[in-house]
Curated annotation (Swiss-Prot):
Protein name, entry field: Dynactin subunit 2-A
General function of this protein: Part of the dynactin complex that activates the molecular motor dynein for ultra-processive transport along microtubules. In the dynactin soulder domain, binds the ACTR1A filament and acts as a molecular ruler to determine the length. Modulates cytoplasmic dynein binding to an organelle, and plays a role in prometaphase chromosome alignment and spindle organization during mitosis. Involved in anchoring microtubules to centrosomes.
UniProt-listed PANTHER family: DYNACTIN SUBUNIT
Gene (UniProt): dctn2-a
InterPro entries from the UniProt entry: Dynamitin
Amino acid sequence: MADPKYADLPGIARNEPDVYETSDLPEDDQAEFDAEELTSTSVEHIIVNPNAAYDKFKDKKVGTRSLDFSDRITKSKRTGYESGEYEILGEGIGMKETPQQKYQRLLHEVQELTQEVEKTQSTVKESAAEEKLTPVALAKQVASLKQQLVSTHLEKLLGPDAAINLTDPDGALAKRLLTQLDAAKTRKNPEGKSPAKGPGPDTENLVTYELHCRPEQNKFSQAAKMAELEKRLGELEVAVRCDQDTQNPLTVGLQGSCLMDTVEILQAKVNLLDVASLDQVEARLQSVLGKMNEIAKHKAAIEDADTESKVHQLYETVQKWDSMSGTLPQVVQRLLTLKQLHEQAMQFGQLLTHLDTTQQMIANSLKDNTNALAMVQKAMKENLATVEDNFSNIDGRIKKLSK
């Protein structure tokens, strides 16, 4: 039961559930900081496409073999996830490339690079002279890289397992040929003993050589040589070719599509300068000069006739304008008056619209006032009848009390 001394205290809510409230937090804790969005250009905003990420990592698995993420109390390190560059490794994870595997990987990558360069040369046109690395130069560098890799003779140092039959068929073929030669040498007679003479050749000591030709490699080398030749011809044409001078008539038409066209044009012009043909050229030039003079005279007469016709047309236009210039001020004054009339008519229309709207508002107000007056009169009649009834009742009671 509640203590009776708190019964009559003010501000106590009775018959309501108890509410326990705590004081507010300090002002430092009440402050709310809105995180500002970084708009600096130094911050890179990366947009991740979930569909592309799913397609990239679909059907991929993470190797959990020999993994240990637990805490350690010893000095030995725990092994977590490992990542590295592309390597041709055997079974197991976390192994380092051996020299043989590194040699195999390099051969494989050089082979892939050669195929990509061949595709590029077959699809892409020869690049411009200002490009630093053309497909032709890239093909030469790839060939030199492959030759340098093969010339290191790493197969002798790394053992017979260094060759890859799939990525380097030439190396596999050479290895097979050397093996057959070694086997043939072992079957020969020892030194100092002459072979036995027989009626026919010894078929067991014969060695059969199979030579395989790669036409695509020959085509590639020929295409590289042709591309290099075309590049050098283009550079020579750029160096020999000069800009066409429009002021010099001797250089007109010398801008050929290639060096051979320019040489042919020059040869034709040199043939025209022969002594036997100079007289004919001079006679033709004299006839052409006479025709040019006649054309110039006719052209001057035609230009004079055109100028005279234009002057007549201009004079007729001025005459028409003189007749219209007298009526132009009156037309302008009428247009200004008509503009003022239109403006006044627009204002009058706006006033009529406002007056009509005001009249409708007044009519609605009068109608509302009439309805309100009728209701007031009806209420007054009812109240008056009620008052009369009350007075009659009071009079009756007074009479009863007086008796």
